[in-house]
Amino acid sequence: MKTIASTALPAHVLQPQYDRQALRSRIVHFGFGAFHRAHQALLTDRVLNAKGGDWGICEISLFSGDTLMSQLRAQDHLFTVLEKGADGNQPIIVGAVHECLNAKLDSLAAIIEKFCEPQVAIVSLTITEKGYCIDPATGKLDTRNERIIHDLEYPDAPHSAPGMLVEALHRRRERGLAPFSVLSCDNIPDNGHVVKNAVLGMAHKRSPELAEWIAANVSFPGTMVDRIVPAATDDSLAEIAREVGVEDPCAISCEPFIQWVIEDNFVAGRPEWEVAGVQMVQDVLPWEQMKLRMLNGSHSFLAYLGYLAGFAHINDCMADSALRDAARRLMLNEQATTLRITGVDLIAYADSLIDRFANPALQHRTWQIAMDGSQKLPQRMLESIRLHLQRDTAWPLLALGVAGWMRYVSGVDDAGNAIDVRDPLSDKIRAIIETSSEEERVAALLALNEIFGHDLPQDPQFVEAITKAYQRISQSGARQAIIDTLSL
């Protein structure tokens, strides 16, 4: 069978210009998903093209991904990233990955031993918020999680990412090997501290002495990641096959824009990511808040309200003047004003986001962005609302965004069509929807302390604003509610 590894590719396809035989598994990565392929793996590939070296990546998947990894092996661990701009496409063959391990294809034991190889300097992760097994109410390890319960009973055969990391560090310590840095690349607030809390929480349960050693010797750099990477579809894979002349089941499409901001705190070295445009900084938090509130907050706003109004893609929302205006006003009037970042032109940043959202080549589905809202709302909207309440400043579009989520999870769009709601709290949410009337809906959903905490549901100003916004959507539909809110 022809693959990208065995076929002469068209001249416009960018290919690795370095010796892939020199690569070693210096980076072990959890989660061979779409975002990692189009972001961290691609940027590491750029460093190798510029500098050469041995910073190869070994991909790890525990309980899924065996088909994808079999396909990756069949094409010498190469895959295609298609950057899709309004002016045309650029296909890139990424060669930084040179090895992969999967629990089903290989074994759990082989995966754990891979972490223990002396050359491993970084363990990176894109496993989504759920993968860290953190209790959202406390920010600490969720000891009720089934995988955590298993790992505490069988620490040498872990099923969770925290369990795997702790067992690997335990073995490295026992063997006198240097520790590695743990690099979360997930789009969650304070991701370095999230993974640190998970690892130290697990280690403390096993051995306080081990936890002390990890705290003293392992670093957990924070990161901010940014690139719009829609999930692969049959159409996107077919388009990539036309571009490169052969099918690539591991391929992914994305926008041309890419940004990675990393806290420069590594205990065992790192690639020279700066040459690929990565920003190495002392404090990631201001960058992270800018992105989560201005980009992700407006993305979620458009996802809920756009989907309700019948818009299938973000670029469809951008073609509507009301939604486009609302997104920009939300960014600048209600989100930018909550930030403490310096040296960044936030008006120019907002304009660049609007241009990126309008990219017709991406076809980023509103339904995809609307997933897992219970885990996204707090950092994307609710943190900003708390600041507005403290300052007594206006936040009508944030209120509409939260109300849009409530209307979306109610399960019916403005045209009366059923919505396939995907959320970690979907069972709880469904029970609330089924047992509350339309008039009771806001109060019933606000009782979800995992999302709203204990403070917001007790704040009369907050409750009134969300209730009015919800009524506006219920009575007039999402698009008209946006128009009415813009005229307030």
Predicted feature descriptions by range:
Residues 1-488:
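Substrate/ligand-engaging "lid" and interaction regions
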